[in-house]
């Protein structure tokens, strides 16, 4: 779907022609969340008017909706967007930079932030330079400005720059790998990893539900993912009102699947090892 809806044409290093897929299943997640919004809207309509709704939603719809500034800009000016790597198409500087030792991201969104960046880095080089005086000019002269900044940033370590950015109130972040993220204090403070006991695997770490901090919370951090067919029998009995013999018949002939104690869950490995 990322290929069909143009996402892969704008993702990846700008100097390469190879299409790149976004590394997580974001479209599946967004479609689910959009579906929930549709359901909630339908429930509100039902409560107000007594009328139900048929919700028609597709991955394609959500992919186009999610193209936001890229898609809308094309609709306005008709120009096919190109790959920009980590760069932002309408804001400069807004991208990844390589420090002396490792990478960081810089997001200079406002003119005030750019003024602070100039004062931090090199007023003699950047100040009073009409090519960079406004964001529009910086977008036009992107390559020149990025070249100057990249040269400056390469002379000191990432921690040096991040500390200075913080002092000058300039948005920035280290570019972490997944291990770095799970080692961060905020990950632990926000309880972003749950530990549950799975009936066939044993102790199992899970990504937490982001709604866990809603008060009072309706999400649980103690229930493991269900086994294949774990609730089939319960649903057929309580919601479809099927008798036990019919459920057993459907299970035995393969029409449905009811989980058994010996069900095994395969664990994948997406590491580089």
Q: Where are the regions a protein language model picked out?
A:
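Beta-strand segments within the central parallel beta-sheet cores of soluble alpha/beta enzyme folds
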Residues: 52-60, 164, 247-251
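Flexible, small-/acidic-enriched active-site or ligand-binding loops
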Residues: 200-249, 269
């Amino acid at each position: 779907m990322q290929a069909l809806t143009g996402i892969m044409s704008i993702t990846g290093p700008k100097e390469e022609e190879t299409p790149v897929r976004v590394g997580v299943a974001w479209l599946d997640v967004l479609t689910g969340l959009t579906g929930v919004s549709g359901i909630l809207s339908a429930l509100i309509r039902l409560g107000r008017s007594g009328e139900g709704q048929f919700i028609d939603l597709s991955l394609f719809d959500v992919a186009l909706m999610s193209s936001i500034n890229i898609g809308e800009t094309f609709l306005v000016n008709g120009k096919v967007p190109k790959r920009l790597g980590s760069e932002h198409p309408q804001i400069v500087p807004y991208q990844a930079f390589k420090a002396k030792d490792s990478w960081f991201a810089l997001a200079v969104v406002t003119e005030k932030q750019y003024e602070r960046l100039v004062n931090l880095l090199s007023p003699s080089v950047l100040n009073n330079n009409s090519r960079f005086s406004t964001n529009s000019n910086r977008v036009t002269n992107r390559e020149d400005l990025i070249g100057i900044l990249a040269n400056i940033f390469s002379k000191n370590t990432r921690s040096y720059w991040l500390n200075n950015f913080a002092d000058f109130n300039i948005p920035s972040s280290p570019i972490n790998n997944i291990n770095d993220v799970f080692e961060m204090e905020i990950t632990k403070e926000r309880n972003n990893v749950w530990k549950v006991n799975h009936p066939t695997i044993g102790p199992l770490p899970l990504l937490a539900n982001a709604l866990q901090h809603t008060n009072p919370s309706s999400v649980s951090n103690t229930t493991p993912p269900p086994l294949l067919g774990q609730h089939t029998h319960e649903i057929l009995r309580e919601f479809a009102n099927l008798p036990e013999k019919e459920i057993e018949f459907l299970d035995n002939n393969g029409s449905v699947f009811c989980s058994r104690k010996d069900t095994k869950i395969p664990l994948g490995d997406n590491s580089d090892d």
